[in-house]
Amino acid sequence: HRAIGLPMDSTYSAQHKMNLLEPLGVESSDLDLEMESSEEDQDYAEKLLKSVGSQAGKLQVSVSPVSRQPYKVWPAQHFAKLSDWLIESQGAQLYFLYGPGEEHFIESVKKEMNNDPMPDVGIPDLLQTRALLGKMDIHLGNDNGLRHLAIAAGIPTLGIFGKPSAVSWTPPGPTQHRSVEYDPGCKQSCTYPECEHLSCIRDVPVDEVHQALKNLLNDHIL
């Protein structure tokens, strides 16, 4: 038996776990998240979108401003600003996605918006949500499970990060998955839950996220 040293630099989480297996002779360079959806789930997603007024040719955007961890919740007013921009400037049809007990996050954003998003699509099950995300053109959201599903669905994503390292949770390589984070100087010595200001997420500049969103759209959609 021998101890395996753990790399201390920031590494994509999946790569980090694969690195632990290398001393055992297990190697892999395939880090792609894969989650197939059935024809039944695809039909469900298509009918759901049709029922709420989805229009072919319109930019389809999923937005997930939710998280059960306070250090992952970007302010509602910032999501509202970008949501309004997507609707007004890009003609987007915007869908808020959330899980059980997270409706209040959505309502907080809607109250700050000047435009109406698409009607609520409810809370589909996991595979139905994966199929729904596959119908989207792009995903914007906090660092949460829905972003991982969007990545598995193969659509471009933009994640907003607080306490966790963006490098650890954003697939390396292809530029269709991007992230924005802010370090107020204490991310490496975080004292959460003693931390009260949570500036690592609350102070992520909305202008930087806006620019990153524009770049992602220009590079992969428009």
List where the protein language model places each region.
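Catalytic machinery of carbohydrate-active enzymes
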Residues: H1-L222
